[in-house]
Amino acid sequence: MKVVCIIVLFVIVAVNESATSEANTSNAAKDTKKKNVTLQFPSYIQNPKQLALELLKICKNNKSSHNSLTSRSSYNYYAINDKYVDFKNCTFLCKHDKDINVTLNMPPNTPCGPNGQTCADKSQCVGHIPGC
């Protein structure tokens, strides 16, 4: 149920973002603050909502470039799921349409460990241990 709620929230944010030509990440973050959403990111991620919105933006941009190459989809659907964010490998799953999943890289400045590690040096990253 949580997964469905999170995906619905990201789709709502995505629709709000695409509905206004001047929408940006800070406006989407304001919309997200109105909802009670708990993201399952490690404790070393200081602002989980900001990271989720950044990953969603990367997913959207990848969807746009994917559509320009294939022009397969005519509607604007993209989503991420916090359960499929891999901090050890600095990747996340981006869902395009109902049946297209793409694994994308997280930005190099993304924290990937409790001691200040970032995705700029993936060899130093640690995996997320549930419950810790």
Curated annotation (Swiss-Prot):
Induction info: By feeding.
Localization annotation: Secreted
Signal peptide per UniProt: 1-18
Major location category of this protein: secreted
GO cellular component labels: extracellular region
Assigned keywords, A-Z: Glycoprotein, Secreted, Signal
Function, as annotated: Salivary tick protein that downregulates host immune system by binding to both dendritic cells, and CD4(+) T cells. Specifically binds to the CD4 coreceptor on T cells. This interaction prevents the activation of the Src kinase, Lck, and its downstream substrate Zap-70, and results in deficient activation of PLCgamma1, the repression of calcium fluxes triggered by T-cell antigen receptor (TCR) ligation, and a subsequent reduction in interleukin-2 production. (Microbial infection) Protects Borrelia garinii from anti-Borrelia antibody-mediated cytotoxicity in vitro. May facilitate B.garinii transmission in mouse model.
Subunit organization: Interacts with host CD4. Interacts with host DC-SIGN (CD209). (Microbial infection) Interacts with Borrelia outer surface protein C (OspC).
Sequence similarity: Belongs to the salp15 family.
Name under which the protein is recorded: Salivary protein 15 Iper-2
Organism: Ixodes persulcatus
